[in-house]
Amino acid sequence: MAKGKQSGSSNSRDELMVNCSFCGRSSDEVNSMIAGPNAFICDRCIQSAVDIIKHDLSAITTKRRSNKTAKLVKPTEIRDELNKYVVGQERAKKALAVAVYNHYKRIESQEWLLEEDDVVIEKSNILLIGPTGTGKTLLAQTLANILDVPFTIVDATSLTEAGYVGDDVESILARLLQAADYNLERAEKGIIYIDEIDKIARKSANVSITRDVSGEGVQQALLKILEGTVAGVPPKGGRKHPEQHLINVNTKNILFICGGAFEGLEKVISRRLAQNAMGFGTAITAASEKESIELISKVTPEDLYQFGLIPEFIGRMPFIATLDPLNKEALKNILIEPKNAITKQYKKLFEMENVELIFDTDALDLVVDTAVKRGTGARALRSVLEEVMLNIMFDLPNMNEVKTCIITKECIEKKAEPMYLYGESERKKSA
């Protein structure tokens, strides 16, 4: 180590004088100078480096603590966040909030639970039952956003047993890996939503002698990844090939949410309730919408078995949440209330063009009425509006003088042009 303020003649001092390779200070300007291979560093630069490292480590630690806390969002907080994006479905929101909280609390607790002395907490996979367009997919997607975890959606009807044409169940994990940018640690704590799960039910409760490669066979194939296993996944998706490098994905901490409409399930439930009440089967009459909602809320694992899900699959779905059909009031609220309501999205797009977008109340009511007739729930709201807004948004970028665009009932009913406002007071209908 060379030190500053060396004694001796001027010539000897010049020979001993060295400069810091980082800041350029000479040895007589600092307290000490450390020599390395072809380089020197002074005590001031060392102190600066220590301060920088401490600051960076502190920031990393804070971020890790923040991420750790974020995973354990309380059920009430999860429900409140869901309320910002999903209208109604209070029963389903509460069930999802509890299931998700328990799932990620289970993951965090694995670091300190004793293997022999503590109770093993099983996975809390979720089954969502409800008509088309009631918010099953949106609930799952919103949960993933709240928790900041990778998320992917899979259509159960595209899955087949290994060895048959179609996607095998391990392709689900490949999609989750892609959603996580191939960050294995994040992927192994992600959420997978399997839609149309009711479409892979057996056609009857009796075991068929024929091979069901897209029904019961897929249910059997899903069992291991639902419960927790290490599966080899091709790095870029697709089918496995001999000598191919595989990424081993552990599914024990992946949350699976399965959803389906389960059309006809209310008849299965009604038959069971009738048998319990009368002691024998009675004629099943057509149930009203209100009665169907009440029946679906009383679903049991036995009903799901009678519908066509195998017992092992049902056993891996401990949380069952039912969703209600959407009435006109709910659809109207979906149009305008959620944080990402479709009308708010259109208003934002128009705002980017410096145009204010206004929807007349009568126009919104007609959108709802049209959506109800189409029978696809909230999905129909978007399709109805897109049909109306397409031509308007096509022409809007060329209409530099427009300040306000008003969507009227005639726009929905007759595909008429909207009312445009030019400047502060002049209202003019488009030619």
Swiss-Prot record:
Q: GO:BP terms for this protein? A: cell division; proteolysis involved in protein catabolic process
InterPro entries assigned to the protein according to its UniProt record, in alphabetical order:
AAA+_ATPase (IPR003593), ATP-dep_Clp_protease_ClpX (IPR050052), ATPase_AAA_core (IPR003959), Clp_ATPase_C (IPR019489), Clp_protease_ATP-bd_su_ClpX (IPR004487), ClpX_bact (IPR046425), P-loop_NTPase (IPR027417), Znf_CppX_C4 (IPR010603)
**A Pfam family matched in the record:** AAA_2
UniProt entry keywords in alphabetical sequence:
ATP-binding, Chaperone, Metal-binding, Nucleotide-binding, Zinc
Which molecular-function annotation in GO is an example for this chain?
protein dimerization activity
Q: Does the keyword Protease apply?
A: no
Positions with a binding annotation for Zn(2+): 20, 23, 42, 45
For the ClpX-type ZB domain, which residue ranges apply?
A: 6-61
Q: Which residues bind ATP?
A: 131-138
- List the record's Gene Ontology CC terms alphabetically: HslUV protease complex
Instruction: Please indicate if the UniProt record lists Secreted as a keyword.
Output: no
Q: Quaternary structure per UniProt?
A: Component of the ClpX-ClpP complex. Forms a hexameric ring that, in the presence of ATP, binds to fourteen ClpP subunits assembled into a disk-like structure with a central cavity, resembling the structure of eukaryotic proteasomes.
Q: Its function? A: ATP-dependent specificity component of the Clp protease. It directs the protease to specific substrates. Can perform chaperone functions in the absence of ClpP.
For this chain, the family text in UniProt reads:
Belongs to the ClpX chaperone family.
Protein name as it appears in the record? ATP-dependent Clp protease ATP-binding subunit ClpX
